[in-house]
Regions:
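Active-site-proximal or metal-binding-adjacent scaffold patches in catalytic folds
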Residues: 1-126, 135-170
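Walker B catalytic acidic pair
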Residues: 131
Length: 170
């Protein structure tokens, strides 16, 4: 047998755990028809299963909360307000653990840590402005900071992020 499937509820969320003999190390989760499906290695202990199911539910809920923010509209409004270039793509990322945001100027793409969805809006706006400024000035030189400093809460937001352990995104 390749996979064993079990169902449970975690809080309000219905979860389906799929134990796969083909899966060796990784844990993956995705939503199917309102059910969070969590795939784990078949040899994983019940304690490890509980840990990873809880972790995947937390990640999914964090992603869901970030979906409530209309990111494209917010980025477009900030780009207009502060006269900064518009990106071709902007998305939330669950994989950004050491950065609040990142920008690839050559692709005109911006990624924002989904953790920002839980921070005050003015902090999110600062990180967006910071990343938008990279579309015009990739390096952290004086021209870059002149663009970022158009946002009136730059110093306050930088202080907030420093207190959280990370100063800026890149």
């Amino acid at each position: 047998m390749d996979a064993e499937v079990g169902a449970l509820n975690v809080g309000e969320m219905e979860v389906e755990v799929v134990r796969s003999s083909r899966r060796r190390k990784t844990v993956q989760a995705w939503e199917v028809g309102g059910v969070l499906r969590v795939a784990i290695p078949a040899r994983m202990s019940r304690a490890e299963e509980q840990h990873w199911v809880g972790e995947m539910v937390r990640r999914f809920e964090r992603r869901r909360s970030s979906d409530h923010i209309d990111l494209r509209a917010r980025v477009a409004a900030l780009a207009r307000r502060y006269e900064l270039p518009h990106p071709l793509s902007v998305e939330w990322s669950d994989r950004q653990r050491s950065l609040w945001g990142s920008c690839t100027p050559a692709l005109r793409s911006i990624r924002l840590s989904s953790r920002l969805a839980r921070e005050p809006g003015w902090v999110l706006d600062y990180v967006i402005v910071h990343e938008l400024a990279h579309l015009a000035e990739p390096a952290h030189g004086p021209e870059f900071w002149a663009l970022v400093n158009r946002y009136p809460r730059t110093e306050r937001a930088r202080g907030w992020l420093m207190a959280k352990g990370l100063e800026d995104g890149d």
